[in-house]
Protein backbone atom coordinates (compact mmCIF):
# COMPACT_ATOMS: atom_id res chain seq x y z
CA UNK A 1 0.00 0.00 0.00
CA UNK A 2 1.62 3.22 -1.19
CA UNK A 3 0.80 6.29 0.90
CA UNK A 4 1.32 9.83 -0.34
CA UNK A 5 1.56 12.63 2.19
CA UNK A 6 1.34 16.39 1.86
CA UNK A 7 2.25 18.76 4.68
CA UNK A 8 -0.59 21.29 4.97
CA UNK A 9 1.43 23.18 7.60
CA UNK A 10 3.69 22.35 10.54
CA UNK A 11 1.02 20.38 12.45
CA UNK A 12 -1.40 19.04 9.83
CA UNK A 13 -0.55 16.38 7.24
CA UNK A 14 -2.80 15.10 4.45
CA UNK A 15 -2.37 11.40 3.67
CA UNK A 16 -3.90 9.66 0.65
CA UNK A 17 -3.81 6.09 -0.56
CA UNK A 18 -5.72 3.41 -2.42
CA UNK A 19 -6.56 0.21 -0.56
CA UNK A 20 -7.10 -2.83 -2.73
CA UNK A 21 -10.12 -5.06 -2.23
CA UNK A 22 -7.67 -7.95 -1.80
CA UNK A 23 -6.04 -6.19 1.17
CA UNK A 24 -9.43 -5.78 2.86
CA UNK A 25 -10.35 -9.40 2.06
CA UNK A 26 -7.07 -10.64 3.51
CA UNK A 27 -7.60 -8.60 6.67
CA UNK A 28 -11.18 -9.90 7.02
CA UNK A 29 -9.94 -13.50 6.76
CA UNK A 30 -7.27 -12.90 9.42
CA UNK A 31 -9.84 -11.43 11.78
CA UNK A 32 -12.25 -14.31 11.08
CA UNK A 33 -9.56 -16.91 11.86
CA UNK A 34 -8.73 -15.11 15.10
CA UNK A 35 -12.39 -14.86 16.11
CA UNK A 36 -13.04 -18.53 15.29
CA UNK A 37 -10.61 -19.58 18.04
CA UNK A 38 -12.65 -17.99 20.84
CA UNK A 39 -16.16 -17.54 19.43
CA UNK A 40 -19.18 -19.42 20.79
CA UNK A 41 -21.67 -20.58 18.14
CA UNK A 42 -24.50 -23.04 18.74
CA UNK A 43 -23.73 -26.44 17.23
CA UNK A 44 -19.96 -26.06 17.47
CA UNK A 45 -17.43 -26.52 20.24
CA UNK A 46 -15.73 -23.32 21.37
CA UNK A 47 -12.55 -22.86 19.38
CA UNK A 48 -13.74 -25.19 16.62
CA UNK A 49 -16.08 -22.86 14.72
CA UNK A 50 -15.33 -23.05 10.96
CA UNK A 51 -13.99 -19.80 9.51
CA UNK A 52 -16.65 -19.99 6.77
CA UNK A 53 -19.39 -19.87 9.46
CA UNK A 54 -17.79 -16.84 11.12
CA UNK A 55 -17.53 -15.07 7.75
CA UNK A 56 -21.13 -15.82 6.86
CA UNK A 57 -22.54 -14.62 10.17
CA UNK A 58 -20.32 -11.61 10.84
CA UNK A 59 -19.05 -10.50 7.43
CA UNK A 60 -20.32 -6.92 7.83
CA UNK A 61 -18.79 -6.45 11.29
CA UNK A 62 -15.52 -8.08 10.23
CA UNK A 63 -15.31 -5.87 7.14
CA UNK A 64 -15.82 -2.75 9.27
CA UNK A 65 -13.10 -3.91 11.66
CA UNK A 66 -10.77 -4.68 8.75
CA UNK A 67 -11.32 -1.22 7.26
CA UNK A 68 -10.56 0.37 10.63
CA UNK A 69 -7.37 -1.69 10.89
CA UNK A 70 -6.28 -0.52 7.45
CA UNK A 71 -7.05 3.10 8.38
CA UNK A 72 -4.86 2.71 11.47
CA UNK A 73 -2.07 1.43 9.21
CA UNK A 74 -2.49 4.53 7.01
CA UNK A 75 -2.25 6.79 10.07
CA UNK A 76 0.85 4.95 11.37
CA UNK A 77 2.58 5.30 7.99
CA UNK A 78 1.58 8.98 7.71
CA UNK A 79 3.12 9.67 11.13
CA UNK A 80 6.41 8.05 10.06
CA UNK A 81 6.53 9.82 6.69
CA UNK A 82 5.83 13.16 8.40
CA UNK A 83 8.88 12.58 10.60
CA UNK A 84 6.79 12.49 13.75
CA UNK A 85 6.21 10.05 16.62
CA UNK A 86 2.99 8.52 17.92
CA UNK A 87 3.22 10.75 21.00
CA UNK A 88 3.11 13.80 18.72
CA UNK A 89 -0.34 12.83 17.43
CA UNK A 90 -3.32 14.73 18.86
CA UNK A 91 -6.97 13.80 18.54
CA UNK A 92 -8.58 11.58 15.93
CA UNK A 93 -7.71 11.90 12.19
CA UNK A 94 -10.23 13.62 9.93
CA UNK A 95 -11.28 11.18 7.20
CA UNK A 96 -12.28 13.37 4.25
CA UNK A 97 -12.59 10.57 1.68
CA UNK A 98 -13.46 6.89 1.95
CA UNK A 99 -14.81 5.93 -1.47
CA UNK A 100 -15.57 2.23 -1.91
CA UNK A 101 -15.32 0.91 -5.45
CA UNK A 102 -15.46 -2.60 -6.90
CA UNK A 103 -11.80 -3.42 -6.48
CA UNK A 104 -10.48 -0.67 -4.20
CA UNK A 105 -11.12 2.04 -1.62
CA UNK A 106 -9.78 5.56 -2.14
CA UNK A 107 -8.80 7.07 1.20
CA UNK A 108 -7.85 10.61 2.18
CA UNK A 109 -7.35 11.72 5.76
CA UNK A 110 -5.67 14.46 7.77
CA UNK A 111 -3.57 13.69 10.81
CA UNK A 112 -2.79 16.47 13.29
CA UNK A 113 0.11 16.89 15.68
CA UNK A 114 0.76 18.88 18.84
CA UNK A 115 2.17 22.30 18.01
CA UNK A 116 5.44 23.62 19.36
CA UNK A 117 4.63 26.69 21.48
CA UNK A 118 7.14 29.31 22.63
CA UNK A 119 5.73 31.80 25.17
CA UNK A 120 8.93 33.79 25.71
CA UNK A 121 8.14 37.37 26.68
CA UNK A 122 4.66 36.62 28.02
CA UNK A 123 5.38 38.85 31.05
CA UNK A 124 5.09 41.95 28.85
CA UNK A 125 1.49 41.01 28.03
CA UNK A 126 0.28 41.18 31.64
CA UNK A 127 -1.92 44.31 31.80
CA UNK A 128 -1.12 47.08 34.26
CA UNK A 129 -3.57 47.15 37.13
CA UNK A 130 -3.96 48.16 40.75
CA UNK A 131 -5.17 45.84 43.45
CA UNK A 132 -8.82 46.64 44.18
CA UNK A 133 -9.55 48.66 47.33
CA UNK A 134 -11.99 47.51 49.97
CA UNK A 135 -13.96 50.39 51.49
CA UNK A 136 -15.37 50.47 55.01
CA UNK A 137 -18.90 50.65 53.62
CA UNK A 138 -18.24 47.39 51.72
CA UNK A 139 -17.30 45.70 55.00
CA UNK A 140 -20.28 47.18 56.84
CA UNK A 141 -22.70 46.02 54.14
CA UNK A 142 -21.27 42.49 54.18
CA UNK A 143 -21.39 42.38 57.97
CA UNK A 144 -25.03 43.52 57.91
CA UNK A 145 -25.83 40.71 55.45
CA UNK A 146 -24.11 38.24 57.77
CA UNK A 147 -26.05 39.53 60.77
CA UNK A 148 -29.28 39.09 58.84
CA UNK A 149 -28.37 35.50 57.91
CA UNK A 150 -27.56 34.36 61.45
CA UNK A 151 -30.13 36.42 63.36
CA UNK A 152 -32.63 34.14 65.12
CA UNK A 153 -36.23 33.88 63.94
CA UNK A 154 -38.85 35.09 66.37
CA UNK A 155 -42.56 34.37 66.29
CA UNK A 156 -44.73 37.44 65.76
CA UNK A 157 -47.45 37.96 68.33
CA UNK A 158 -50.33 40.00 67.06
CA UNK A 159 -52.70 40.19 64.15
CA UNK A 160 -50.63 41.89 61.47
CA UNK A 161 -50.53 40.42 58.00
CA UNK A 162 -47.65 38.58 56.34
CA UNK A 163 -45.20 40.86 54.51
CA UNK A 164 -42.13 40.56 52.31
CA UNK A 165 -39.12 39.61 54.44
CA UNK A 166 -41.18 37.59 56.91
CA UNK A 167 -40.85 33.84 57.34
CA UNK A 168 -44.11 31.94 57.01
CA UNK A 169 -44.79 28.54 58.59
CA UNK A 170 -47.67 26.99 56.69
CA UNK A 171 -49.30 23.92 55.14
CA UNK A 172 -49.90 23.72 51.41
CA UNK A 173 -51.24 21.34 48.80
CA UNK A 174 -51.23 21.91 45.05
CA UNK A 175 -53.83 20.82 42.50
CA UNK A 176 -53.84 20.78 38.68
CA UNK A 177 -57.27 20.35 37.09
CA UNK A 178 -58.60 19.58 40.57
CA UNK A 179 -56.18 16.68 41.09
CA UNK A 180 -53.36 16.75 43.68
CA UNK A 181 -49.92 16.14 42.16
CA UNK A 182 -46.79 14.43 43.55
CA UNK A 183 -44.45 16.72 45.47
CA UNK A 184 -47.10 19.42 45.81
CA UNK A 185 -47.87 18.97 49.49
CA UNK A 186 -46.09 19.87 52.76
CA UNK A 187 -46.90 20.66 56.37
CA UNK A 188 -45.27 23.26 58.64
CA UNK A 189 -43.12 24.42 55.73
CA UNK A 190 -41.01 27.53 56.46
CA UNK A 191 -40.53 29.99 53.59
CA UNK A 192 -39.01 33.47 53.42
CA UNK A 193 -41.54 35.64 51.61
CA UNK A 194 -39.84 37.48 48.75
CA UNK A 195 -37.04 34.92 48.37
CA UNK A 196 -38.58 33.70 45.09
CA UNK A 197 -37.98 30.07 46.04
CA UNK A 198 -41.45 29.14 44.82
CA UNK A 199 -42.98 29.65 41.36
CA UNK A 200 -44.04 33.19 40.35
CA UNK A 201 -47.21 34.35 42.07
CA UNK A 202 -47.03 31.95 45.02
CA UNK A 203 -45.25 34.19 47.54
CA UNK A 204 -47.01 37.34 46.31
CA UNK A 205 -50.32 35.55 46.85
CA UNK A 206 -49.45 34.89 50.50
CA UNK A 207 -48.67 38.53 51.33
CA UNK A 208 -51.31 39.93 53.70
CA UNK A 209 -52.39 36.57 55.11
CA UNK A 210 -52.88 36.42 58.88
CA UNK A 211 -52.09 33.59 61.28
CA UNK A 212 -54.82 30.95 61.21
CA UNK A 213 -56.20 32.07 57.84
CA UNK A 214 -56.63 29.86 54.79
CA UNK A 215 -56.41 30.83 51.13
CA UNK A 216 -56.46 29.37 47.63
CA UNK A 217 -53.69 30.81 45.45
CA UNK A 218 -53.94 30.50 41.68
CA UNK A 219 -50.60 30.26 39.86
CA UNK A 220 -49.16 29.05 36.56
CA UNK A 221 -46.10 26.82 36.32
CA UNK A 222 -43.38 28.27 34.03
CA UNK A 223 -43.12 26.77 30.54
CA UNK A 224 -39.55 25.66 31.33
CA UNK A 225 -40.44 24.10 34.69
CA UNK A 226 -38.35 21.04 35.54
CA UNK A 227 -41.27 18.62 35.83
CA UNK A 228 -42.64 18.20 32.29
CA UNK A 229 -46.07 17.11 33.55
CA UNK A 230 -46.50 20.49 35.30
CA UNK A 231 -44.74 22.86 32.86
CA UNK A 232 -47.10 25.58 31.63
CA UNK A 233 -50.04 24.25 33.68
CA UNK A 234 -52.46 26.34 35.77
CA UNK A 235 -52.53 25.26 39.42
CA UNK A 236 -54.29 26.05 42.68
CA UNK A 237 -52.49 25.85 46.02
CA UNK A 238 -54.53 25.56 49.21
CA UNK A 239 -52.69 27.38 52.00
CA UNK A 240 -53.10 27.44 55.78
CA UNK A 241 -50.82 29.88 57.66
CA UNK A 242 -49.71 28.76 61.16
CA UNK A 243 -47.03 31.29 62.14
CA UNK A 244 -45.35 34.49 61.03
CA UNK A 245 -41.70 34.80 62.02
CA UNK A 246 -39.18 37.58 61.49
CA UNK A 247 -35.48 37.95 62.06
CA UNK A 248 -34.53 40.07 65.04
CA UNK A 249 -31.32 41.61 63.78
CA UNK A 250 -29.05 42.70 66.65
CA UNK A 251 -27.21 45.99 66.49
CA UNK A 252 -23.99 44.25 67.42
CA UNK A 253 -22.59 40.72 67.31
CA UNK A 254 -22.50 39.00 70.68
CA UNK A 255 -19.97 36.34 71.73
CA UNK A 256 -22.22 33.45 70.71
CA UNK A 257 -22.72 34.89 67.21
CA UNK A 258 -18.99 35.50 66.80
CA UNK A 259 -18.30 31.86 67.64
CA UNK A 260 -20.89 30.87 65.06
CA UNK A 261 -19.28 32.87 62.22
CA UNK A 262 -15.67 32.19 63.33
CA UNK A 263 -15.99 28.55 64.48
CA UNK A 264 -12.28 27.66 64.37
CA UNK A 265 -10.98 30.67 66.29
CA UNK A 266 -10.08 30.41 69.97
CA UNK A 267 -10.69 34.10 70.53
CA UNK A 268 -13.23 35.32 67.95
CA UNK A 269 -13.59 39.10 67.88
CA UNK A 270 -15.48 41.58 65.75
CA UNK A 271 -12.17 43.04 64.56
CA UNK A 272 -11.03 39.60 63.36
CA UNK A 273 -14.36 39.09 61.60
CA UNK A 274 -13.96 42.42 59.79
CA UNK A 275 -10.46 41.36 58.67
CA UNK A 276 -11.88 38.10 57.28
CA UNK A 277 -14.72 39.95 55.56
CA UNK A 278 -12.24 42.44 54.09
CA UNK A 279 -10.11 39.61 52.67
CA UNK A 280 -13.18 37.85 51.27
CA UNK A 281 -14.36 41.04 49.53
CA UNK A 282 -10.83 41.65 48.22
CA UNK A 283 -10.69 38.14 46.74
CA UNK A 284 -14.13 38.59 45.16
CA UNK A 285 -13.05 41.89 43.60
CA UNK A 286 -9.79 40.38 42.35
CA UNK A 287 -11.69 37.43 40.87
CA UNK A 288 -14.07 39.81 39.10
CA UNK A 289 -11.18 41.99 37.87
CA UNK A 290 -9.30 38.96 36.53
CA UNK A 291 -12.25 37.38 34.73
CA UNK A 292 -13.90 40.50 33.36
CA UNK A 293 -10.89 42.65 32.49
CA UNK A 294 -7.38 41.23 32.89
CA UNK A 295 -7.87 37.75 31.48
CA UNK A 296 -9.65 38.89 28.27
CA UNK A 297 -6.94 41.53 27.66
CA UNK A 298 -4.12 39.05 28.25
CA UNK A 299 -5.78 36.37 26.10
CA UNK A 300 -6.27 38.77 23.19
CA UNK A 301 -2.66 39.97 23.38
CA UNK A 302 -1.29 36.41 23.73
CA UNK A 303 -3.17 35.10 20.69
CA UNK A 304 -1.89 38.07 18.70
CA UNK A 305 1.74 37.69 19.84
CA UNK A 306 2.24 33.92 19.79
CA UNK A 307 1.57 32.70 16.26
CA UNK A 308 1.68 29.00 15.44
CA UNK A 309 -0.28 26.46 13.41
CA UNK A 310 -3.10 24.69 15.23
CA UNK A 311 -4.41 21.11 14.77
CA UNK A 312 -7.23 21.03 12.24
CA UNK A 313 -9.18 18.30 14.04
CA UNK A 314 -9.25 20.23 17.32
CA UNK A 315 -10.38 23.37 15.48
CA UNK A 316 -13.21 21.40 13.85
CA UNK A 317 -14.29 20.15 17.29
CA UNK A 318 -14.35 23.73 18.56
CA UNK A 319 -16.44 24.80 15.55
CA UNK A 320 -18.81 21.89 16.27
CA UNK A 321 -19.27 23.14 19.82
CA UNK A 322 -19.79 26.79 18.84
CA UNK A 323 -22.23 25.77 16.11
CA UNK A 324 -24.23 23.60 18.55
CA UNK A 325 -24.36 26.44 21.07
CA UNK A 326 -25.68 28.80 18.40
CA UNK A 327 -28.21 26.33 16.95
CA UNK A 328 -31.16 27.44 19.12
CA UNK A 329 -30.71 31.04 17.93
CA UNK A 330 -31.19 30.10 14.25
CA UNK A 331 -34.54 30.57 12.54
CA UNK A 332 -36.49 27.45 11.48
CA UNK A 333 -35.70 28.32 7.85
CA UNK A 334 -31.97 28.49 8.61
CA UNK A 335 -32.09 25.17 10.46
CA UNK A 336 -33.78 23.55 7.47
CA UNK A 337 -31.23 25.07 5.09
CA UNK A 338 -28.26 23.85 7.13
CA UNK A 339 -29.72 20.33 7.30
CA UNK A 340 -30.33 20.12 3.56
CA UNK A 341 -27.64 22.31 1.96
CA UNK A 342 -24.05 21.15 2.58
CA UNK A 343 -22.55 24.27 0.98
CA UNK A 344 -24.64 26.57 3.18
CA UNK A 345 -23.62 24.56 6.23
CA UNK A 346 -19.92 24.72 5.30
CA UNK A 347 -20.15 28.47 4.71
CA UNK A 348 -21.81 29.01 8.09
CA UNK A 349 -19.22 26.86 9.86
CA UNK A 350 -16.46 28.96 8.29
CA UNK A 351 -17.89 32.01 10.07
CA UNK A 352 -16.79 30.39 13.34
CA UNK A 353 -13.36 29.33 12.10
CA UNK A 354 -11.28 32.35 13.16
CA UNK A 355 -12.73 32.40 16.68
CA UNK A 356 -12.31 28.63 16.91
CA UNK A 357 -8.65 28.81 15.82
CA UNK A 358 -7.96 31.56 18.37
CA UNK A 359 -9.70 29.58 21.10
CA UNK A 360 -7.63 26.47 20.34
CA UNK A 361 -4.45 28.55 20.09
CA UNK A 362 -5.17 30.09 23.50
CA UNK A 363 -5.65 26.62 25.01
CA UNK A 364 -2.15 25.59 23.88
CA UNK A 365 -0.70 28.91 25.12
CA UNK A 366 -2.28 28.39 28.55
CA UNK A 367 -1.01 24.80 28.63
CA UNK A 368 2.54 25.94 27.88
CA UNK A 369 2.36 28.84 30.37
CA UNK A 370 1.22 26.41 33.05
CA UNK A 371 4.19 24.16 32.22
CA UNK A 372 6.66 27.07 32.26
CA UNK A 373 5.36 28.39 35.58
CA UNK A 374 4.97 24.96 37.15
CA UNK A 375 1.23 25.30 37.68
CA UNK A 376 -0.33 21.89 38.29
CA UNK A 377 -3.65 20.48 39.46
CA UNK A 378 -3.71 16.95 40.85
CA UNK A 379 -6.44 14.42 40.18
CA UNK A 380 -7.27 14.60 43.89
CA UNK A 381 -7.87 18.36 43.61
CA UNK A 382 -10.27 17.72 40.71
CA UNK A 383 -12.18 15.16 42.79
CA UNK A 384 -12.32 17.56 45.76
CA UNK A 385 -13.67 20.36 43.55
CA UNK A 386 -16.38 18.07 42.15
CA UNK A 387 -17.29 16.84 45.65
CA UNK A 388 -17.54 20.44 46.88
CA UNK A 389 -19.80 21.33 43.96
CA UNK A 390 -22.00 18.33 44.78
CA UNK A 391 -22.26 19.20 48.49
CA UNK A 392 -23.15 22.79 47.65
CA UNK A 393 -25.99 21.69 45.37
CA UNK A 394 -27.20 18.92 47.69
CA UNK A 395 -26.19 16.05 45.38
CA UNK A 396 -24.46 12.75 46.05
CA UNK A 397 -20.71 13.48 45.53
CA UNK A 398 -19.81 9.99 44.27
CA UNK A 399 -22.66 10.00 41.76
CA UNK A 400 -21.67 13.53 40.69
CA UNK A 401 -18.09 12.43 40.08
CA UNK A 402 -19.24 9.35 38.16
CA UNK A 403 -21.49 11.50 35.96
CA UNK A 404 -18.54 13.72 34.94
CA UNK A 405 -16.34 10.65 34.43
CA UNK A 406 -18.92 8.96 32.17
CA UNK A 407 -19.29 12.15 30.14
CA UNK A 408 -15.50 12.32 29.67
CA UNK A 409 -15.47 15.73 31.34
CA UNK A 410 -12.67 15.20 33.89
CA UNK A 411 -9.82 16.40 31.57
CA UNK A 412 -11.80 19.55 30.69
CA UNK A 413 -12.50 20.26 34.38
CA UNK A 414 -8.81 19.77 35.18
CA UNK A 415 -7.80 22.13 32.37
CA UNK A 416 -10.27 24.72 33.61
CA UNK A 417 -8.83 24.49 37.13
CA UNK A 418 -5.27 24.81 35.79
CA UNK A 419 -6.34 27.89 33.83
CA UNK A 420 -7.94 29.49 36.89
CA UNK A 421 -4.89 28.72 39.01
CA UNK A 422 -2.54 30.07 36.32
CA UNK A 423 -4.34 33.38 35.91
CA UNK A 424 -4.68 33.84 39.67
CA UNK A 425 -0.90 33.49 39.88
CA UNK A 426 -0.18 35.66 36.83
CA UNK A 427 -2.23 38.52 38.22
CA UNK A 428 -1.17 38.15 41.86
CA UNK A 429 0.29 41.62 42.28
CA UNK A 430 0.77 41.19 46.01
CA UNK A 431 2.91 38.08 45.45
CA UNK A 432 4.99 39.84 42.79
CA UNK A 433 5.50 42.85 45.08
CA UNK A 434 6.72 40.55 47.88
CA UNK A 435 9.14 38.85 45.46
CA UNK A 436 10.46 42.22 44.29
CA UNK A 437 10.88 43.37 47.90
CA UNK A 438 12.85 40.23 48.81
CA UNK A 439 15.05 40.68 45.74
CA UNK A 440 15.81 44.31 46.64
CA UNK A 441 16.74 43.32 50.21
CA UNK A 442 19.02 40.56 48.92
CA UNK A 443 20.79 43.02 46.64
Curated annotation (Swiss-Prot):
Gene designation per UniProt: tig
This protein's UniProt keywords:
Cell cycle, Cell division, Chaperone, Cytoplasm, Isomerase, Rotamase
Subcellular location(s) of the protein = Cytoplasm
Instruction: Write down the SUPFAM superfamilies for this protein, in alphabetical order.
Output: FKBP-like, Triger factor/SurA peptide-binding domain-like, Trigger factor ribosome-binding domain
What molecular functions are annotated in GO for this chain?
A: peptidyl-prolyl cis-trans isomerase activity; protein folding chaperone; ribosome binding
Record-linked InterPro entries: PPIase_dom_sf, PPIase_FKBP_dom, Trig_fac, Trigger_fac_C, Trigger_fac_C_sf, Trigger_fac_ribosome-bd_bac, Trigger_fac_ribosome-bd_sf, Trigger_fact/SurA_dom_sf
Superkingdom is: Bacteria
Which cellular component terms (GO) are annotated to the entry? cytoplasm
This protein's species is: Campylobacter concisus (strain 13826)
Domain writeup: Consists of 3 domains; the N-terminus binds the ribosome, the middle domain has PPIase activity, while the C-terminus has intrinsic chaperone activity on its own.
Where does this protein chiefly localize? cytoplasm
What's this protein's function? Involved in protein export. Acts as a chaperone by maintaining the newly synthesized protein in an open conformation. Functions as a peptidyl-prolyl cis-trans isomerase.
PPIase FKBP-type domain location is 165-250
Write out the catalysed reaction. [protein]-peptidylproline (omega=180) = [protein]-peptidylproline (omega=0)
According to its UniProt record, the EC number is: 5.2.1.8
Q: Does the keyword Cell cycle apply?
A: yes
BP GO annotations: 'de novo' cotranslational protein folding; cell division; chaperone-mediated protein folding; protein transport; protein unfolding
Q: What is this protein called?
A: Trigger factor
In the record, the note on similarity to other proteins reads:
Belongs to the FKBP-type PPIase family. Tig subfamily.
Amino acid sequence: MEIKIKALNSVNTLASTTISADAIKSSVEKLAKKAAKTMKVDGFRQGHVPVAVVLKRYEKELTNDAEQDVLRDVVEEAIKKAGKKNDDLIGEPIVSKFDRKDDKIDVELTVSFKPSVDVSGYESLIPEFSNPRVLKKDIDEKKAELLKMIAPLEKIDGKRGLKVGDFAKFDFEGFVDGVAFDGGKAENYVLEIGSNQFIPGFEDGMVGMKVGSEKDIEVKFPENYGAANLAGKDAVFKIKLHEIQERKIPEKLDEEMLKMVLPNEENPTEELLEERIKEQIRQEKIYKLINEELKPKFAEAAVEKFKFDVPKNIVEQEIDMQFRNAWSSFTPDDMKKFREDKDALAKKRDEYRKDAENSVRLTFIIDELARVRGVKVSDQEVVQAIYFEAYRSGQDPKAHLEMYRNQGMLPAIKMSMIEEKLFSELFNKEKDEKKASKKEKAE
